[in-house]
Structure formats: structure tokens, C-alpha cells
Amino acid sequence: MASEAMELNGGVNRRDDPGARPQQGRMSRNTPLNMNHYANKKSAAESMLDIALLMANASQLKTVLELGPSFSFYIPLITLISISLTLQIIVGILLIFIVKWNLNDSSKHYILNLLENIVTALVFIVVVVNVFITAFGVQRPDDKTS
């Protein structure tokens, strides 16, 4: 098992001194990947994308509300945008929990895996809902005065 861990971390069959420690550096191939750091960066990137989509949906909601009930797809768009915003807030909260828990604690692996799967499913639903929002269209009619 120890040799397997050494092999995974790049310490087996090295040409230099067998007792030498792996180089410590940001881009070194010999340093093991810090999974907690990687997961935190991944979750932060997902959160930034979630914030961008949240802002886009808020803008779409504002436009639909300005168009008023006379707009042909008023109720469906209000419903879809509200669903999308709610799901995005839930995803954001779940991502905060995922980032806060220590990935190296094996007792938390099951719950972290479950949360990751839930977040993935919710993000898929958000994407599908936003496809329908785009299909219905949220553009203001052109004000042509002639």
C-alpha cells in the first residue's frame, strides 16, 4: 500500500536520490495534488458562473415585469425565471456547504458525494429551464416612431 501511494505521488523509480523529498513548488510534477484546494477552486468557479446566471435572470425578470401582463408569455416567463432563480440560490447554498467541509475527512465523503450529485442535477435543471426562458424570449419590442 505504501509503495502504491508512493507510485501515485510520483516517488517510485525516480532517477535521483531515493531518500530525496519531492520538489516543493506550484507547478512541480512531484508534489501530490491537494484535493481540498482543487475542490475549493472548482466550487468557487461554479459559484461565479452561478452568480453570472443569477444576474442575467434578474435582468430578464425586470424586463418581463416592465413589459407587464399584456406580454404574451408573461406568466410562463415569470414562472420559469422564478424557478431558475430559486434553484440557483439553492445551488449556491449547497456549494457553500461543499466548500466548507474538509474533503480529506473520509467520514464526510458520502455526504459530499451526495451533495455534488444534487448540485449537478440542479444545475442541469437550471440549464433546461433557462433554455425555455430563452425560447420564449424576453426582448423588449422595438419602439419605432415614424
UniProtKB/Swiss-Prot annotation:
Keyword set includes Cell membrane: yes
Which BP terms from GO are recorded?
angiogenesis; cell adhesion; cellular hyperosmotic response; cytolysis; ferroptosis; heart development; heterotypic cell-cell adhesion; killing of cells of another organism
Region (Helix alpha2): which ranges?
A: 55-71
Disordered: annotated span: 1-33
Location of the region described as Helix alpha1 in the Swiss-Prot/TrEMBL record: 41-52
Q: Molecular function (GO) terms listed?
A: cell adhesion mediator activity; lipopolysaccharide binding; membrane destabilizing activity
Q: Which residues are glycosylated?
A: N57
Q: What happens when the gene is disrupted?
A: Morpholino knockdown of the protein results in impaired heart and skeletal muscle development.
Provide this UniProt record's keywords sorted from A to Z.
Answer: Angiogenesis, Cell adhesion, Cell membrane, Cytolysis, Glycoprotein, Inflammatory response, Membrane, Synapse, Transmembrane, Transmembrane helix
For the Cytoplasmic compartment, the record's topological domain ranges are 101-110
One term under GO cellular component:
synaptic membrane
Q: What Pfam families does the entry give?
A: Ninjurin
Regulation of protein activity = In normal conditions, NINJ1 is inactivated. In response to death stimuli, homooligomerizes and disrupts membrane integrity by introducing the hydrophilic faces of alpha1 and alpha2 helices into the hydrophobic membrane. Homooligomerization and ability to mediate plasma membrane rupture is inhibited by glycine; it is unclear whether glycine directly or indirectly inhibits homooligomerization.
Region of interest (Required to induce plasma membrane rupture), residue spans: 37-66
Residue ranges in the Extracellular topological domain are 1-75, 136-146
Q: Which residues cross the membrane?
A: 76-100, 111-135
**Purpose of the protein:** Effector of various programmed cell death, such as pyroptosis and necroptosis, which mediates plasma membrane rupture (cytolysis). Oligomerizes in response to death stimuli and forms ring-like structures on the plasma membrane: acts by cutting and shedding membrane disks, like a cookie cutter, leading to membrane damage and loss that cannot be repaired by the cell. Plasma membrane rupture leads to release intracellular molecules named damage-associated molecular patterns (DAMPs) that propagate the inflammatory response.
Subunit and interaction comment: Homooligomer; in response to death stimuli, homooligomerizes into long, highly branched filaments and large, ring-shaped structures in the membrane.
Report the family membership: Belongs to the ninjurin family.
Q: What's the protein here called?
A: Ninjurin-1
Instruction: Look up and give the organism this protein is from.
Output: Danio rerio
The uppermost taxa in this organism's lineage are:
Eukaryota, Metazoa, Chordata, Craniata, Vertebrata
